[in-house]
């Protein structure tokens, strides 16, 4: 005879909360299972902790586990744990009459638009059961009390009574009477999916009672008896049925006394463990093989390849957390797609999954790192909004970055593997130099470049510094589109001739790197394409430079006047050997390469383009025969039309060779054709045939307008 039930009213705030949960639509109802499994795990933690000092606490049940039993016929989902259990007092107080401190706060958060998945953070995760159930019973047995059953259909009250039906031994059994429109939560596949997503690394076995089939050979008599028995049972129970799949037509007909055999399919149930991948991060790293790390990495990331490197560590003291970080072998094709949710580092709190896209857990430039972080100090189910303000998370982030730096540093010791890593993730490191001022120096150590002395190999800035000549003060570099382009550039002629190594930076992101990486190990990084290049020189070289400056002063002034606003100034160069001239930019303006990159931007700022790309100066090579002959020609006749033609042509050609683009390529081409005609001895005024005229088109004169002519007069 059932015990008489006591009825209790829900505390007002809890009644409001339940009403809110029941009457509001939430899309991610699946979190109810996470919350109930999390509570079960907490109950198991408590009994395990008590058993450390008193092993007899486990006499009522040695095995610690969580079990899920879906029953489609009855429409119920049962969650059983062998945890500490609840006394009658616990059931009354914890499940209804005493509001948790977070109840009101959670309701306010919900009404303000917070996600239902935050419910556990406020200590009221149990009530999420009413997202999918219209009635819940909780049977519980604590070592210090009898077995009791709590029941409520959320109508403002609940009942508690003693329960003598099925002894639990110890622990809690929650039965959810699933709503008619939520029966998909009784499907094996759905339950497995939710457990795999949210509770895969709970520290106790999660078992699911699954229904399976097996073939069994029986005699006709047995089959008939079984069938009759099944038909009888089918009226009032959902026990396994036996299904006839046909007779064996090849039975031995000669022996009439022999009983015919039948193959039948027999349904049966068994427990299937859902979380076989144990929390590997909770184990001692010394006890874990590379194969185990590999298996865990693949289960975590769904990658088919092994990881490239792994870092397993724990932090203890005022703050406690464990972490397992992996570097993959390849970069995903959508690594820098900001709109895509990245599944990189999974955040757990006490082995309960919280979120897999915690942006504040690691900087964006390290978004290729995969792994898990399991904190003992964060509140369970902390929201994204609260994470941004959480001091614990900031400390975890700092430690993760530090350990990632250590991991990459360890990888640099294996040259072959580091090359694989660098080929895939060099952009991330360079983005880090751009964004992370605290770790800029460390990240600079990881960078690798081709240089004028490295051949086909990459070398580090540290290697470069170790090879610097005694009289070399700076690290020289050049940016450009490709190794071939920069290695043949006019800018590196003198530097290479002096025996100084030049770093080749050929990725667009390198331009952003050098804006922030001004020096390395006390050595200033100097661009060979910018004005003011200083090279070590002796007294004789210094004297020659001063003489050249005086000798070509008048030519520089003339060229400056001819080019007018196209250049800021014309000066004698100390960087050229084989080229007659080059275009350099100001220290704070864009290089030719940067200007090219910015012009390619779809959303470029035209105003910024104007003042950042404006400052150019033309440097001439005093030792080049073209420049020397031009000087002599200009000294002989400053008004010589050919001098102006040649100056403009030299300027436009040096623009191209220095990496800039021409505003009017057609005009430049016409000038080249005119020069070709002169070289071939074709008279400028000689009439062309009709065919020639059609093919040549209207070539602009080299001196097109009166404005240019007036500049020539000013030179006089």
From Swiss-Prot:
GO molecular function: ATP binding; ATP hydrolysis activity; ATP-dependent protein folding chaperone; unfolded protein binding
UniProt region (Disordered), positions on chain: 213-262, 687-716
Chief place of localization: cytoplasm
InterPro entries found in the cross-reference section: HATPase_C_sf (IPR036890), Heat_shock_protein_90_CS (IPR019805), HSP90_C (IPR037196), Hsp90_fam (IPR001404), Hsp90_N (IPR020575), Ribosomal_Su5_D2-typ_SF (IPR020568)
Residues noted as binding ATP in the record, renumbered to the chain: 39, 81, 100, 126, 384
Biased composition (Basic and acidic residues): 225-244
Localization per Swiss-Prot or TrEMBL: Cytoplasm
Phosphoserine carried by residues: 219
Keyword Translocase in annotation: no
Short name of any one Pfam family annotated for the protein: HATPase_c_3
GO cellular component annotations of the record: cytoplasm
UniProt keyword annotation of Nucleotide-binding present: yes
Motif (TPR repeat-binding): 712-716
Entry keyword set: ATP-binding, Chaperone, Cytoplasm, Nucleotide-binding, Phosphoprotein, Stress response
Family classification: Belongs to the heat shock protein 90 family.
Comment block on domains: The TPR repeat-binding motif mediates interaction with TPR repeat-containing proteins.
Subunit structure: Homodimer. Interacts with shu.
Function: Molecular chaperone that promotes the maturation, structural maintenance and proper regulation of specific target proteins involved for instance in cell cycle control and signal transduction. Undergoes a functional cycle that is linked to its ATPase activity. This cycle probably induces conformational changes in the client proteins, thereby causing their activation. Interacts dynamically with various co-chaperones that modulate its substrate recognition, ATPase cycle and chaperone function. Required for piRNA biogenesis by facilitating loading of piRNAs into PIWI proteins.
NCBIfam families per UniProt: PRK05218.1
This protein's name: Heat shock protein 83
